[in-house]
């Protein structure tokens, strides 16, 4: 790099600029009407609790700590556990598959007498270009065909395309194409969380439910880098490890049917 040892700092500085732009955008985005109504109910319930007045079941729900509320109601508890398993599938499998795309293709390029670092860059760009398309595409597809079938297709396709990338494709240029397709499904599938999760949680706990579902699996996935060397040796290299992790998609695929289809339905109150 022409920027020397400070190149990584420049990269992170550039990466934070969109976050600052989003922070500015946030100042012009109003709170939703449903949240405003729910917040007013919460304030009233807290006032009744402080004054010792009689409280309804809804009042008790509104004054509970929202994280505990996720597990208080049987139906919400069921949904929380299911979406946690789906999020764990997405996060853990994505780490175990995507991390090794650049070194895997770089190794293939090296065997063909081509510069490995250059092809590792091509691999990363191809994978992430596909992922961007997947981020955008999942939302349109879910609105057209429904949340359940599209999420199940993304899980199933991720499993198959991991085999296609790491086991079935040998041509170097085709590896870049398959890497893009793999990125479309394995990383692009993260969009299901922003599409489906808001439609599964009541307003009073929606943000808490989304934050828990999105972030809790990371407390498991973060251990991956700590054991990466051991896992690569255990599974016989990059490809063996990636294929082994792809079977996690069976878990996500299996639990999706247990959730309600929410396409075209209003957000819970």
Stretch-by-stretch model annotation:
Residues 1-3, 105-106, 141-142, 228-236:
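Interfacial helix-cap and linker-helix signal at transmembrane-aqueous boundaries
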Residues 2-5, 167-178:
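Helix-loop junctions at membrane interfaces in 12-TM secondary transporters
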Residues 74-133:
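Extracytoplasmic gate region of multi-pass secondary transporters
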Residues 129, 203-235:
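A late C-terminal transmembrane helix in Major Facilitator Superfamily
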Residues 144-155:
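Cytoplasmic membrane-interface "Motif A"-like loop-to-helix N-cap segments
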Residues 188-201:
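Intracellular juxtamembrane helix-capping segments at the cytosolic ends
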